[in-house]
Design a protein with these regions (language model features):
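The feature marks the mature, well-folded catalytic cores of soluble enzymes
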Residues: 1-163
Length: 163
């Protein structure tokens, strides 16, 4: 699942891993609202990890909306993000496959926002997407090819989100 910590919303791709009952229990205990949807890759296979297709930060959400095939669910995700003031940066399946959904916003020692993404994710973005993201925060783009090719995850997967 991907958490909007500011607005206490938990976004989750419905699959065997993020079980609806467990998600609802998590949300109830921590005061979050769930947004559950089905998402698939370009080949139609289920997306198990929401952070493959979505990043939600303070002001920006990076989302592969085309992976949410059901129009009502896609509209619900989009409405939820927009209603909380997020600017949506839509990514394509190709960008998602280059880990562009696997980003994480952190803050540096001075409290300034930084967006961590792999070099592959960064290179998959358009010039306009990069310029927009850079206008909002500092981008940190390490080369994680070894991790991405051998482990299957990327930048967000490497950072423990205990904060």
């Amino acid at each position: 699942m991907v958490l909007d910590r500011v607005n206490k919303i938990a976004y989750a791709c419905e699959s065997p891993r993020p079980n609806r009952t467990v998600l609802e229990d998590f949300c109830k205990q921590l005061g979050y609202s769930p947004v559950l949807f089905k998402a698939v890759g370009a080949d139609g296979t289920e997306i198990y990890h929401t952070n493959v297709m979505m990043h939600v930060g303070t002001e920006v959400a990076v989302v592969c909306l085309e992976s949410v095939r059901d129009e009502a669910q896609r509209a619900e995700v989009k409405e939820s993000l927009e209603s909380t003031g997020k600017t949506i940066v839509e990514i394509t399946f190709d960008q998602m496959n280059h880990f562009a959904g696997n980003m994480l916003e952190l803050h540096n020692k001075d409290g300034q926002p930084c967006l961590i993404m792999s070099l592959a994710a960064y290179h998959s973005l358009t010039k306009e997407q990069v310029e927009f993201l850079e206008s909002k925060m500092t981008l940190i783009t390490p080369d994680l090819e070894c991790i991405e090719q051998n482990g299957g995850g990327s930048a967000r997967c490497m950072i423990a989100e205990i904060f």
